[in-house]
C-alpha cells in the first residue's frame, strides 16, 4: 500500500479537550484518508480557537464506528476538520444529515462534486468557467506513449493537497507505460499552463481576497511545497491590476455559489503568463487551517483573525433535510 492511500481504521479515538462551555462541539479530524496528517495539524489550531471561544470540545479521530461514537457523545455541532476520503467527499455530511447533527463546511453534493476532478470539471465547464484542456485515462487503456503533448499534469481523481500530482516536462525521463496508477484506476491528464498561481479565500459566499504563490524551490505547487516553510512565498494581496483582481474574486464567488458551497472554501487559478487568461484549477471545500494555510492568511488580511474565522465557520453549521 502506498503511504498516501486511504487506510481502514475500525475504532475512533475520542478525547475530551474542554468539559465545559456554551455548546458542545465535536472536532472531527485525522480519519482514514491520505491527508490524515494535514487534518490533524489543522485541528490543533482549531481546537485552541474553539476553547478560547468558550465551547465544550471533544476531539474525534474518526474511525469506522463514528456513528456509534457520535450517538454516545451527543454533540450540538460537528466541526468537520477532515480532509480527503470520507470527510471531504460528502461521506461524513451524509451521515450527519441522517443523524440530524449540524456540521460545518459544505454538504453532500457540493463536497462530492468538488472532490471528484472529473465531475467538478464538467460542472465548471457547464457554468462557463474556463479550464485547461484535459482527458481522462484509464489504467485499462494500456497507453504506452504520452497521452497528451508535453508539458502535461497527471492528477489523481480524488486526492487533495497535491498528493499524487506530477508535472511531466519535455526534458523529463518519463515513460507513461511505466506509470503505476497508485491512487486508483483513473487519472486526469491536463494541459500544463505556465503562469502565476493564484488562490482565493471564500467565506459564506463572499471572496475575502486573493494571494499569489511564488515558488522558491520546486517546479510546481506540490505537497512538499504546500507544507514546508521556505518552499514558497505568499504575496497577499496578489499583485494584480485592479480589474483582474476583481475578476478573480467574482469568478471565485461564482464557482462557490453555483456549487452551493457552505462555510469556507479556497478557489485555485492559474493566470497564463502570455495572455493574462485565467484558468480555474479547482475549488477546495475543506481548506487547511494550519499556520502555512492560505484561507487563514487571506482572512487575516481582510481583518478576520483566526479565532474569529473559526467563530464565523461555526455560525454556518447546519444539516440538510
From Swiss-Prot:
Annotated keywords: ATP-binding, Cell shape, Cell wall biogenesis/degradation, Cytoplasm, Ligase, Magnesium, Manganese, Metal-binding, Nucleotide-binding, Peptidoglycan synthesis
Location in the cell: Cytoplasm
Residue span, ATP-grasp domain: 121-315
EC number: 6.3.2.4
Positions of disulphide bridges: none
Main location group: cytoplasm
Pfam entry (one): Dala_Dala_lig_N
InterPro entries with a match to the protein in the record: ATP-grasp, ATP_grasp_subdomain_1, D-Ala_lig_Van_CS, D_ala_D_ala, Dala_Dala_lig_C, Dala_Dala_lig_N, PreATP-grasp_dom_sf
Pathway recorded for this protein: Cell wall biogenesis; peptidoglycan biosynthesis
Binding-site positions, Mg(2+) 2: 282, 284
Chain sites annotated for binding ATP: 147-199
Superkingdom of origin: Bacteria
Cofactor: how bound: Binds 2 magnesium or manganese ions per subunit.
Chain sites annotated for binding Mg(2+) 1: 268, 282
Reactions catalysed according to its record: 2 D-alanine + ATP = D-alanyl-D-alanine + ADP + phosphate + H(+)
A single MF term (Gene Ontology): metal ion binding
NCBIfam families according to UniProt: D_ala_D_alaTIGR, PRK01372.1
Cross-referenced PANTHER family: D-ALANINE--D-ALANINE LIGASE (PTHR23132), D-ALANINE--D-ALANINE LIGASE B (PTHR23132:SF23)
Family per similarity comment: Belongs to the D-alanine--D-alanine ligase family.
Record's function text: Cell wall formation.
Protein name: D-alanine--D-alanine ligase
Amino acid at each position: 500500500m502506498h503511504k498516501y492511500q486511504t487506510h481502514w481504521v475500525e475504532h475512533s479515538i475520542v478525547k475530551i479537550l474542554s468539559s465545559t462551555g456554551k455548546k458542545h462541539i465535536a472536532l472531527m479530524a485525522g480519519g482514514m484518508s491520505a491527508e490524515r496528517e494535514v487534518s490533524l495539524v489543522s485541528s490543533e489550531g482549531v481546537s485552541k480557537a474553539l476553547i478560547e471561544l468558550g465551547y465544550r470540545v471533544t476531539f474525534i479521530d474518526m474511525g469506522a464506528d463514528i456513528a456509534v461514537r457520535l450517538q454516545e457523545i451527543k454533540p450540538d455541532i460537528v466541526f468537520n476538520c477532515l480532509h480527503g476520503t470520507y470527510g471531504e467527499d460528502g461521506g461524513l455530511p451524509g451521515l450527519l444529515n441522517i443523524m440530524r447533527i449540524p456540521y460545518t463546511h459544505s454538504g453532500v453534493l457540493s463536497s462530492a462534486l468538488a472532490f471528484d476532478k472529473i465531475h467538478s470539471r464538467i460542472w465548471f465547464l457547464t457554468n462557463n468557467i474556463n479550464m485547461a484542456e484535459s482527458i481522462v485515462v484509464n489504467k485499462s487503456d494500456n497507453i504506452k506513449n504520452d497521452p497528451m503533448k508535453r508539458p502535461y499534469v497527471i492528477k489523481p481523481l480524488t486526492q487533495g493537497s497535491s498528493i499524487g500530482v506530477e508535472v511531466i516536462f519535455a526534458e523529463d525521463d518519463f515513460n507513461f507505460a511505466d506509470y503505476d496508477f497508485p491512487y486508483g484506476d483513473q487519472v486526469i491528464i491536463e494541459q500544463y499552463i505556465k503562469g502565476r498561481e493564484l488562490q482565493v479565500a471564500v467565506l459564506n459566499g463572499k471572496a475575502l481576497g486573493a494571494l499569489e504563490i511564488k515558488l522558491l524551490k520546486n517546479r510546481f505547487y506540490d505537497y512538499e511545497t504546500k507544507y514546508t516553510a521556505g518552499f514558497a512565498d505568499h504575496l497577499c494581496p496578489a499583485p494584480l491590476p485592479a480589474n483582474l483582481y476583481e475578476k478573480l474574486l467574482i469568478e471565485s464567488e461564482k464557482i462557490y455559489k453555483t456549487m452551493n458551497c457552505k462555510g469556507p472554501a479556497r478557489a485555485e487559478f492559474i493566470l497564463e503568463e502570455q495572455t493574462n487568461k485565467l484558468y480555474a484549477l479547482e475549488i477546495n471545500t475543506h481548506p487547511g487551517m494550519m499556520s502555512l494555510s492560505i484561507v487563514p492568511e487571506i482572512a487575516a488580511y481582510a481583518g478576520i483573525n483566526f479565532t474569529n474565522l473559526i467563530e464565523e465557520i461555526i455560525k454556518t453549521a447546519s444539516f440538510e433535510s
